[in-house]
């Protein structure tokens, strides 16, 4: 599946491929090339998928699009590939983000190049982290020595392996 369309919206859950991956969904070799401008102030934004549920697999999905979540008072989440993955039964293998994530500091810690909130013991490997993060109009300094600090919130970082920066 491929999305080449840009999104200009005011939705709480919006992505280039699928809003919510419910139980048992597999997204494989999906590519998002569309940029998302979202005016919602409390969204879960991911340019491949917003929310990932039990027994789902994300495999070799690539995001090339940007997310602009700079609506006044924004306090939602934003990640290049997904916003929230919360079940230990999810598998994430391969994939990459090359897009820019723009948001406000009111979003807090749930902003990342790859995801916003990786909230369990989810086996995750083989990803490429790239792109940029801009918060309150200021670009974060991301490089080969600190990129793991910017891939997104991780409840259990030991589950995340083989992530490279380009």
Model regions and ranges:
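Surface-exposed loop/turn motifs in large extracellular/passenger domains
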Residues: 1-166
């Amino acid at each position: 599946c491929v999305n080449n369309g840009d999104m200009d919206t005011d939705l709480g859950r919006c992505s280039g491929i699928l809003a919510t991956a419910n139980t048992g969904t597999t997204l494989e070799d999906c590519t998002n090339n569309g940029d998302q401008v979202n005016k919602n102030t409390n969204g879960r934004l991911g340019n491949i998928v917003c929310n990932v549920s039990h027994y789902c697999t994300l495999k070799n999905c690539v995001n090339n699009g940007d997310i602009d979540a700079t609506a006044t008072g924004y306090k939602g989440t934003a990640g290049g590939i997904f916003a929230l993955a919360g079940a230990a039964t999810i598998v994430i293998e391969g994939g990459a983000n090359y897009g820019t994530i723009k948001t406000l500091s009111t979003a807090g810690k749930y902003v990342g190049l790859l995801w916003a909130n990786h909230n369990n013991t989810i086996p995750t490997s083989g990803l490429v982290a790239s792109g940029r993060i801009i918060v309150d109009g200021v670009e974060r300094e991301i490089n080969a020595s600190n990129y793991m600090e910017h891939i997104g919130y991780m409840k259990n970082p030991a589950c995340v392996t083989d992530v490279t920066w380009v």
